[in-house]
Amino acid sequence: MACYYALKIIKDLGLPVSKRVRFIVGTDEESGWGDMEYYFAHNGLKDPDFGFSPDAEFPIINGEKGNITEYLHFAGENNGAFTLNTFEAGLRDNMVPESATAVFTADSTLAELQEKFAAFTAAENLKAELVQEGDAFRVTVIGKSAHGSTPELGLNAATYLAKFLDQFAFNGAAKVYLDTTANVLHQDFAGENLGVAYTDAKMGALSMNAGVFKFDRNSNDNTITLNFRYPQGTDAQTIKAELEKLDGVTAVTLSEHEHTPHYVPADDPLVSTLLSVYEKQTGLKGYEQVIGGGTFGRLLKRGVAFGAMFPDYVNTMHQANEFADVEDLYRAAAIYAEALYELIK
C-alpha cells in the first residue's frame, strides 16, 4: 500500500517522468512463487530493467542467499518397550515449528514419565503437556515461531520434544528419527552437525531451519523438512551429498523450487539512489545488507528489497499478531515516492 500511494503521489502532482513503472502484485510469496513464475513466463513483456520489492527492511537488501528445501526420508517401523506412533511438528519449511506433538507407548507409568518430563521442562524452561490417552501417551511441547531465515530467533518445539523422548529406549526407525532430530538438528542453525556449514566473505554464513516433521510408524516414508539459506560458494547438490551421509536416512530429495544466491553491487545506480533517498529522509546512514530471506526483488537481475520495516522497529514477521504501525507506513510511502521519482524522472 505504501508503494501504491507513493505512485499516486507522483501521478497526482503531475511530476514529469521519462520511464514507465510496472506495479506487480504477487500473492504466493510464502508458498513457492508460482504466480511470479507464471507472470514472467506469460506476460509477453520485456522484463523491467530494474526494480525493488517493499518486502523487507530499510536501508536496503541488495543481496539474498540461495534458498533450497531438502527432505530427509526415514522408515517407520519400531517396536519395543517404547514405541513411537506419531511425531508431528511445523506448518512450513520457512518457519520455526511453534508446537510439536508425539504419541507413544511406554513400559512406564504416567507418574514415572511425568517426573522426568517435569525435570526436563523446568531445565529447558518450556511450556509443555504430557497426558495419557488409553494405552498411549501424548506429549506436546510449545516453542516459539520465527522466520526460517533466522531460526536462532525461535524455539524449535520439534527438536526440544525429540530431546526429551531420546532419553528413552526407542528402537528401529523411531530411534534414528529421534536421534537425528535431538542430536544432529537441535540448535544447529549453521548446519555444522550436518557437515554443510559454509561462510562467504560477502554473503555470510549458511543457515538451516528444521521446519516440518512428519512421522507415523505405519508409514515407510517419514520426513524431516530442512530449509537452507546458502551463500555463493556452495549449492543444493553439495548440501544433498552431505545429507546422504547421515546414519539411517533412507533418501534425500529436493524441492522443485530453488533460488540461487542473488547480489546487486553497492555501486549500482539503483542501490546508490535508493540509499541516498533513505539517508536524506531519515538522517540515518545507509548501508548494504545480505539476508537469508527471499523477496521478489531477486526476480530481476537488478532487483533489490527496499523497506518497509525501519531499523528501530520490532520485527514480528511470521509470528502471532504480526503487525505494522500506520505511522511507519506513512514514513515508508514518503521515502518510496521520492525514490521512485528519482528513478523515473
State what each model feature region is:
Residues T27-S31, K144, G294-F296:
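Short, internal active-site loops enriched in acidic
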Residues N62-E88, D93-K144, G148-M208, D235-T250:
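Acidic-enriched catalytic cores of C-N bond-cleaving enzymes acting on peptides and small amides
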Residues G26, V103-D107, N227-R229:
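Short hydrophobic/aromatic beta-strand micro-patches
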Residues M1-E77, Q114, A190-K202:
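Acidic/histidine-rich catalytic neighborhood of metal-dependent amide-processing enzymes
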Residues S149-N220, T225, R229-E244, T250-K345:
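An extended, acidic, His-containing surface patch that forms the Zn2+-binding/catalytic region
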Residues S18-R22, K127, K285-Y287:
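Residues at or immediately flanking beta-strands
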Residues E57-P59, E88-R92, K214, I291-T295:
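Short, solvent-exposed loop/turn elements at beta->coil junctions and helix N-caps
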Residues D35, P97, T316-A320:
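Short acidic, glycine/proline-rich loop/turn micro-motifs
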